[in-house]
UniProtKB/Swiss-Prot annotation:
This is NEDD8-conjugating enzyme UBE2F. Residues 1-27 are annotated as: Disordered. Its EC number is 2.3.2.34. Pathway: Protein modification; protein neddylation. Interacts with UBA3 and RBX2. Interacts (N-terminally acetylated form) with (via DCUN1 domain) DCUN1D1, DCUN1D2, DCUN1D3, DCUN1D4 and DCUN1D5. It comes from the Eukaryota.
């Protein structure tokens, strides 16, 4: 994290003192996304839910990170669920792209990792979709909440999982437990 922040500070220092006319502006410019990410990552790390951990495989690329959610209650308690997040160049006008890397039996996450979470949608009919005022903290808290209060059987992406829950809650729980033992340890 400090590497990109150091780069931003260095670049800010170069603004007033252009030493070479041959140096292009593009080598000095830092994207709006990257400036926002330095601030948001610091805020995120200070305000993570206790059930979440963030990992940056490359500290110079704050736009690519992994999130681990380890629910401490509900159906998914005891599992560790990995999410991959990529923040596009057009951030914060568009939401980050998030995929669940852990196979899971969940009404709002497909077995291939697609996620149904309003704030990850650029356009949402319920008015809770992405807005430029949202931050990575909102995304992380939203993903964490998919395992508790945002678990939604009434508006599923994985219809089969939602119908399974409706048909037989105990068997649904058994299948969730099986997936946790097999894929989320």
């Amino acid at each position: 994290m400090l590497t990109l922040a150091s780069k931003l500070k260095r670049d800010d220092g170069l603004k007033g003192s252009r030493t070479s006319a041959s140096t292009s502006d593009s080598t000095r410019r830092v994207s709006v996304r990257d400036k926002l990410l330095v601030k948001e990552v610091a805020e995120l790390e200070a305000n993570l839910p206790c059930t979440c951990k963030v990992h940056f495989p490359d500290p110079n690329k704050l736009h690519c990170f992994q999130l681990t959610v380890s629910p401490d209650e509900g159906y998914y308690q005891g599992g560790k669920f990995q999410f991959e997040t990529e923040v596009p160049d057009a951030y914060n006008m568009v939401p980050p792209k998030v995929k669940c890397l852990t196979k899971i039996w969940h009404p709002n996450i497909t077995e291939t990792g697609e996620i149904c979470l309003s704030l990850l949608r650029e356009h949402s009919i319920d008015g809770t979709g992405w807005a430029p005022t949202r931050t990575l903290k909102d995304v992380v808290w939203g993903l964490n909440s998919l395992f508790t209060d945002l678990l939604n059987f009434d508006d599923p992406l994985n219809i089969e999982a939602a119908e399974h829950h409706l048909r037989d809650k105990e068997d649904f729980r058994d299948k969730v437990d099986e997936y946790i033992k097999r894929y989320a340890r």
